[in-house]
């Protein structure tokens, strides 16, 4: 193999990844544009939408030239000084614009931008303080917190996308290098520097931490994002596995690197075990994982979850418990094991409740084309009403809608927690009244919401 050719490849890969720069305009023109925005922000009255609009314009201006990064903090501070004018309004407009700006600064400039970021964080703190009185309710705070989460998550997605581009370049490099055969120790050293395993492992570590937190979250949006991050995590882990495998093949061509090759092989096995441990909860769920599970199951409801299952098999995770059905069953409550789901008619309504000592199966559970399940009892399809802690009612309609598209989350105990496509974080349970009506509970309803399908 030509040593100079390898050096060229490594430099090409590094250069390609490090020099994705945007088109730059004349610095004076950009500076003038930013100064106009500063004046516009100084003249803002009580219209928070105008602030967001100005920040969006700033995003365009500041993207044009890295030399303007020092001016970002000035603009942000200008926005901050305008906050005293606000006595009411939609704080999210301001926060959204600021987070957009922060994202632009982070993605546009490779140099230091800590001052600008600090200024944005300080600004958002000011917003929180400003709206902390009567004008700032918990709903608005939740929106702002969600905006922060979305921003951080987007940074992580961008990191994974960058790693994916790196993988494509490096795997092509490795395959090209291995074709020549008879790799020397000097060439091997160059190849080793071209394989960014540390970078991949760092991103995987961040994703793993994110998954560990999200797997037990009771927040619906957080749980849904966690499933997406599991998909990204498994994609990246597979890329790392592929890189290491190809690297081992090259190491085998160098007699002096045989011990090194064995060590790398051991690390490959350790990595696979670590991935299995991270995603094990998917097929061995506890009640604390149920909200996340309600977005993963039914597995065949989306291409993403089907891909997760394929990746899980690649890393040796056993198949999940039964989570699709097609027949007539008894649905037994865990807390009251002699009670089962049944149905009664009340003032023209068909209400699902608990009945004791049901001897024969009567609940029909059937998979829909979209992967969800439909529950039917004596001609009535069960659905959850939209009332607080909704009731399980029956409808004669063939399509009960998303309120009647059920998710069966399999627990490792052998029981199931049941929610709907409409409200994945609300689970079916049997209330402790004399009638034992079937209702839904936000997050974990306890053993009253665990069901065995017989």
Swiss-Prot record:
Contains 2 disulfide bonds. Nematocytes. Residues 19-25 form a propeptide. GO terms for cellular component: extracellular region; membrane; nematocyst; other organism cell membrane. Residues 1-18 form the signal peptide. It is found in: Secreted; Nematocyst; Target cell membrane. Residues 27-61 form a coiled coil. One of its GO terms (molecular function) is toxin activity. Keywords: Cleavage on pair of basic residues, Coiled coil, Cytolysis, Disulfide bond, Hemolysis, Membrane, Nematocyst, Secreted, Signal, Target cell membrane, Target membrane, Toxin. GO terms for biological process: killing of cells of another organism. Negative results: the fraction containing this toxin and CfTX-B does not cross-react with CfTX-1 and CfTX-2 antibodies. Found after both pressure and chemical disruption of nematocysts. Oligomer. The fraction containing this toxin and CfTX-A shows potent hemolytic activity. This fraction causes minor effects on the cardiovascular system of anesthetized rats (at 25 ug/kg), since it has no significant effects on heart rate but produces relatively small increases in mean arterial pressure. Belongs to the jellyfish toxin family. Type II subfamily. This is Toxin CfTX-A. The lineage of its organism: Eukaryota, Metazoa, Cnidaria, Cubozoa, Chirodropida.
């Amino acid at each position: 193999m030509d040593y100079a050719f390898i050096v060229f490849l490594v430099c090409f890969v590094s250069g390609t990844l490090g020099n994705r720069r945007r088109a730059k305009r004349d610095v004076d023109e950009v500076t003038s544009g930013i100064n106009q925005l500063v004046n516009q922000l100084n003249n803002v009255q009580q219209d928070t939408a105008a602030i967001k609009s100005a920040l969006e314009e700033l995003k365009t201006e500041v993207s044009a030239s890295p030399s303007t990064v020092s001016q970002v903090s000035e603009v942000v501070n200008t926005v901050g000084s305008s906050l005293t004018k606000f006595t009411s309004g939609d704080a999210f407009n301001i926060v959204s614009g600021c987070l957009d700006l922060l994202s632009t600064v982070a993605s546009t400039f490779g140099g230091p931008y800590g001052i600008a970021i600090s200024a944005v964080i300080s600004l958002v703190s000011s917003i929180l303080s400003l709206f902390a009185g009567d004008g700032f309710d918990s709903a608005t705070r939740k929106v702002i917190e969600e905006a922060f989460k979305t921003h951080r998550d987007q940074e992580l997605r961008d990191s994974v996308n960058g790693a994916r581009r790196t993988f494509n370049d490096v795997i092509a490099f490795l395959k090209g290098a291995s074709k020549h055969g008879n790799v020397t120790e000097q060439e091997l050293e160059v190849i080793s520097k071209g394989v960014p395993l540390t970078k991949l492992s760092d991103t995987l570590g961040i994703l793993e931490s994110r998954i560990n937190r999200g797997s037990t979250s009771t927040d619906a949006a957080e749980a849904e994002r966690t499933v997406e991050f599991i998909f990204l995590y498994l994609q990246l882990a597979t890329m790392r596995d592929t890189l290491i495998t190809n690297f081992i093949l090259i190491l085998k061509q160098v007699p002096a690197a045989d011990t090194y090759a064995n060590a790398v092989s051991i690390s490959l096995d350790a990595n696979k075990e670590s991935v299995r441990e991270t995603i094990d909860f998917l097929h061995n769920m506890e009640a604390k994982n149920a909200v996340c599970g309600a977005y993963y199951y039914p597995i065949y409801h989306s291409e993403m979850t089907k891909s997760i299952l394929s990746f899980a098999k690649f890393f040796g995770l056993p198949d999940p418990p039964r989570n699709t059905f097609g027949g007539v069953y008894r649905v037994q409550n865990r807390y009251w094991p002699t009670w089962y789901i049944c149905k009664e008619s009340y003032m023209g309504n068909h209400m699902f409740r608990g009945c004791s000592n049901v001897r024969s199966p009567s609940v029909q559970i059937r998979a829909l084309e979209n992967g969800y399940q439909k529950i039917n009892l004596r001609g009535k399809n069960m659905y959850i009403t939209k009332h607080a802690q909704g009731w399980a009612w029956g409808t004669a309609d063939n399509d009960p809608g998303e309120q009647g598209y059920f998710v069966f989350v399999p627990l490792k105990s052998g029981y199931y927690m049941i929610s709907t496509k409409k409200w994945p974080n609300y689970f079916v349970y049997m209330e402790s009244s004399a009638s034992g009506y079937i209702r839904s509970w936000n997050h974990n309803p306890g053993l009253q919401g665990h069901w065995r399908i017989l």
